[in-house]
Regions:
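Short, small-residue-biased leader/transition segments that mark boundaries at the very start
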Residues: 1-4
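Fold-core signature of tandem repeat domains
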Residues: 7-14, 21, 27, 34, ...
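Short, charged/polar, low-complexity loop and linker segments
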Residues: 19-22, 146-152, 178
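Extended intrinsically disordered, low-complexity coil regions enriched in Ser, Thr, Gly, Ala
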Residues: 55-63, 180-186
Length: 257
């Protein structure tokens, strides 16, 4: 009777541990050798509990196998490893310089909620890539804004094209704001980087300047009959030397007067 009772106890131990433990945080994240030791304890117990009544296990065997399950289960270190890795990753993430407050809060919450080392690793890698993308956006603004705004292609561009470029810059500055920037992802940032490049490429100031110079020259030659050829040539030289549409308009207006 005692042997039968112990065998039932072993089967109960198997039943209560064979599914719940392998699905637990403490098992999933444990060192591989500790997982193997636990698995082997279950396998040995399962084999023993299947013995026939003609060849039953001894009480000592049953007790030893039950104890092996408990011991190898208690030796699992997944929760400890997960906590250690979370602490390490949070420290790394906290030191990233280019994320804004909302992004940091979001990834911190995700790290704290992670249940596996694999998930943590993926989170950390994606966060490092996000930080790199934010740095790319920050560097782009530093190298792009002043040269573009000082260029003929921007200064003489259509108003709506300048507005489109400035709108993209404003959105980028908003994202880069440490305190008030929104929680954007890598795809959002890449989309904005593309928007900035497209808006810059669509600026048509140089083309407009050239067209305006040509039209103004034709106007001076054909319409300003009150001027002699030398006067016309002098005005045309001023128009060709000018790099600003507004100044060209002033030159023509002065010539008319």
């Amino acid at each position: 009777y005692t042997t039968l009772f112990r065998s039932k106890d072993l089967r109960d131990t198997l039943e209560s541990n064979s599914t719940s433990v392998p699905n637990s945080v403490n098992y999933i994240n444990a060192d591989k050798n500790l997982q193997i030791e636990f698995d082997e304890a279950l396998q040995q117990a399962s084999a023993t509990s299947s013995k026939t009544s003609e060849n039953p296990a001894t009480i000592e065997e049953v007790l030893g196998l039950s104890q092996a399950i408990y011991d190898t289960k208690n030796a699992l270190n997944g929760e400890q490893r997960l906590a250690t890795e979370k602490s390490k990753d949070l420290k790394l993430i906290k030191g990233l310089k280019d994320l804004n407050k909302a992004q940091l809060e979001d990834v911190t919450n995700k790290v704290n909620a992670a249940n596996t080392l694999t998930e943590l690793s993926q989170l950390t890698q994606s966060t490092l890539k996000l930080n790199d993308k934010m740095k790319l956006l920050r560097d782009k603004l530093k190298t792009l804004v002043n040269p573009v705004k000082a260029s003929l292609n921007y200064r003489n561009a259509d108003y709506n094209l300048k507005r489109q470029f400035n709108k993209a810059l404003k959105e980028a500055k908003g994202i880069l704001n440490k305190n008030s920037g929104p929680n954007v992802n890598i795809n959002d940032i890449q989309h904005l980087l593309t928007q900035i490049d497209n808006a810059k490429d669509q600026l048509n100031g140089e083309q407009r300047l050239k067209e305006h110079q040509q039209k103004s020259e034709v106007y001076v030659i054909k319409e300003l009959d009150i001027l002699n050829n030398a006067q016309k040539a002098a005005i045309i030289n001023q128009i060709r030397a000018s790099k600003d549409i507004k100044i060209i308009n002033q030159i023509v207006d002065n010539a008319i007067e």
